[in-house]
Amino acid sequence: MGRKRHWRPLVSVMALATGVSLMVAAHGVAANRAKVSPKNPQAFGTLRAVIDTIDYLDPQQAYTGQSWWAMWNVYETLLTYRHVDGPAGYKLVPGLAQSLPTVSRNGKVYKFKLRKGLKYSNGSAVKASDFEWAIKRGFLATGQGVGFYTDIAGAEAYSKNPTPGGDISGIVTNNAKRTITIRLATPRGDFLTILALLFAAPVPGNTDPAIQNGSIPGTGPYKFSNYDPNRSFTMVRNPYFKPTKYIPRGNPNTVEVALVGDADAATQRVINGQSDYSNAAIPPDRIADAKGKGKLLLRKTANTYYFWMNVREAPFNKLKVRQAVNYAIDRKALQTLVWGGLGRPTQNVLPPTYPSYRKLALYGHNVTKAKQLINQAGASGAKVTVWTRNVSDAVTAGQYYTSILNQIGLNASLNVLPRATYYTTIGNVNTHAQTGWARWLEDYPHPLDWFDVLLNGNRITDQDNNNFAWYKNKKTDAQIESLKKAPILTPAVNARWAKVEKQIMERAPWAPWSNRVFPEFFSKNMSCIHTQLLYGIDLARLCKK
């Protein structure tokens, strides 16, 4: 997920390594206590969080890690993930479904049955047909995740002329029996994990296809209220929520979330006692201060930060220019500049936590060679606009990148966009964005979430495109399509993915530079702190003293 940004009983689940270290805490503020429910002895009043941005609070539209961090506790899917720390958080478990599905031997037919008595936060009953409406709604509104569901029989045809009354033939529901049957046109090894994406969260059948930020009823432990675009939103308890052994009620009664793009300001809010938690990229010169005035958790997760180069736009339509950029970047220095070294320099698309990962070292830091390649490509003096978003670490990285492009002979300038519109702008074909900053946090732990979503030319769309490099290559596209059918990540399959990655990076549509370690900053009055590998800090399990 870039934007962000995960599982399964029928295919191998990778045990991604996670390492977190909780550091010393000092001064905080008084806890906001609530009356403790005998059903939940750790319940408390208000959790005050500060994050940098969201894109949407609409399950069929949202596609950033920050949005999903909140929405995971508002919208439930047929299958979901456990609220637990460590690798067990990658295990798929029933969500709205009463059990894991039955799957046909050919891997094409999936049968589910909903739990009894499910209701949305507005009190209306959950129907089996609401699942099909959620998928259709994504196509009707050109949602960012519709490409995940085109392997459902009839979905491709529906996508060409979507109408509210149209039908996706591969989805058959029975409201009276609470059953959902999904038939695929072709087997897809990661389909169960795709069903756990929030894009597939059922919504009431009368939900308007247009974007509905924070107003769509959900089935999770919380519901949204008081959404103020680009400023804040609030989460309160859903009175109709039915907890399961996998999905808890949640500890905070209310979650107040402020949207603050300036990392220094976000850090100061926690130090001052205005917020209990911040996920901002703490400025390097403030890390020591943060350790002394709160609790700092260093969270490792699967992510890659990179600069994309649009292969359709000059000068990046020339391979030598893209290779020059990769040689020019000092990845270690950039990581130190942006995060004080909290991360791991990389030249790979995949994070090192994946069994498909094979470390690449194609582009050693060599500015002289980069300049030579620019000259050989006839690109000296070419005008380039670097795109980034208005968040502290992205701006710093964008400034560095712009200076490097100028250093090797290009004529580059920086364009900083508002946080909320950045991805939709660079993902629009009419923008003709040449190059810029991006990151990807896994949606689910499978190479398809990286190569199919981000670098498969068959998935390019004119709007809300995730392939910012607009990279299309017949050879690697065909390999990705073939690997979709592999149900298990065997050593042989992992080796095939490693080959695809090397072939792509030899064509250099990206300049990957870091697998970041995330600093999560808490005030002293927070006690139990828990993480979930896919969704980050698990707000439902946080506690106050």
Say what each PLM segment does.
Residues 3-29:
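Secretory targeting and sorting signals
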Residues 39, 228, 232, 329-356, ...:
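Detector for C-terminal structural segments
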Residues 42, 111-113, 130-132, 139-204:
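Surface-exposed binding/hinge segments that line
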Residues 123-125, 130, 264-275, 291, ...:
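Short helices/loops that flank or line small-molecule/ion binding pockets
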